[in-house]
Amino acid sequence: MKLSRRQFLQRSTLAGVATVTPTSLWAKNRPSLTIPPMIEVGRGRPVRLDFRPAQTQFNKGKLVDVWGVNGRYLAPTVRVKSGDFVKLTYTNNLPQALSINIQGLQAPTEMIGSIHRAIDKNSSWSPILSVNQSACTAWYHADTMLNSAFQVYRGLAGLWIIEDSESRKASLPNKYGVNDIPLILQDQLINSDGIQVIDTQTNQFFGKRLFVNGQESPYFDVPRGWVRLRIANASLSRHYDLRLDNGKPLYLIATGIGFLADMVEMEHISLAPSERIEVLVDLNEGDKVSLITGKKRDFFDEIGKLFKDNNELNDNVVLEFRPEGLPSALNVTPKLPPFNVEEFNLKITQERKINLRPQDRLINHQRFDPKRIDFTVKKGTVERWYLTTTEEVGFTLQGAKFMVETRNRQAVPHKQLAWRDCVWLEPTQETTLLVKFEHTASEQQPFTFGVSDLMLRDRGCMGQFVVAE
């Protein structure tokens, strides 16, 4: 690679600095990945989720107060089968009111929660959920009006895994915590005492350190073969651009609400705040490899961070895989569940234009008003939404699902068809969605839509809609 004189001088300066910089600055003594405990839901079995203070270590040796569920930082994974009833009990033992949302669960607001269903401190709420949908990876998190970002940042986030009869029969990695790995991504600012720092009065939040399941850029000892990653972006504002640092592909198999027709080979995958994806990685051969966000960094990139004051992460490694055992001669490619393409032959009943101005916290020139219903739709209908934005941002909605039809007037490839509830938007593109409404929401408990950035959402960049019978 040919360097300009300016680049040569910059790198010479950095090289000089490197000789006097402690090795510990770039040495990576990674912690082991923590796997959230699993709550396996049997038919009618009660599930108790106690939201209360907990403790963890962000800086080694410094135990600090955080929030969590059932006594741990972050929340346990809840796994349920489609067709089951779930008797939930949420108990709020935190010092402030709390609302909960299960993003990705397709059900009425009376079941999944809403910003208008607050659980006061020292109180409980016990909904009964009827789970009837295709397999997916959802996440549950604080959704408290004007306060969701702070509460999620403190630790109120976890996964729901919904399975159906077809997903259980598919030849996919399914040993939870072994080759079926949950990854909850959060970027954080941690002070010298090991305490979380956040200014909730800013429009957006970008931390300097990346934590996965509560551990900073960890490693994971994994058996050779195919590995399944269930990745949830629980960061408040940060968007991730995921890839492997050895240049090998990721294989996308599912988005937030369902599977694709077949695994799609991708060099990198975008992940908006609140978005979930499932990907496969082939680790049958080779040495350790890392899942990273952004481009692979070299020595000079690492040292150069000392001179930059921006939103870049100190370490862009999401997870380092350390394969164990011998390669298998029978490393069979996994097969996905059957795909019903007829689900996507949709009859459009109405079209709607939605323009986002995130930094002004406006949608169609209006800021959020908890007393205003922005529109009403009929259950069972499908609408085409035309989305535009003045800045790059994630878009999401509650209680309904959509497929991405076009980006910048170009049809999305058939192989990428899948149901979603979150999508990343670019300011230079118009994105069209086909939105399907299958569950009701009343005026007292409406569904919400808007940006998926929780900071901007708390500051008013969202709206409400009703789904009537």
Curated annotation (Swiss-Prot):
Its main location: periplasm. It is found in: Periplasm. This is Cell division protein FtsP. Pfam families: Cu-oxidase_2 (PF07731), Cu-oxidase_3 (PF07732). Residues 1-27 form the signal peptide. It comes from the Bacteria. One of its GO terms (biological process) is FtsZ-dependent cytokinesis. Keywords: Cell cycle, Cell division, Periplasm, Signal.
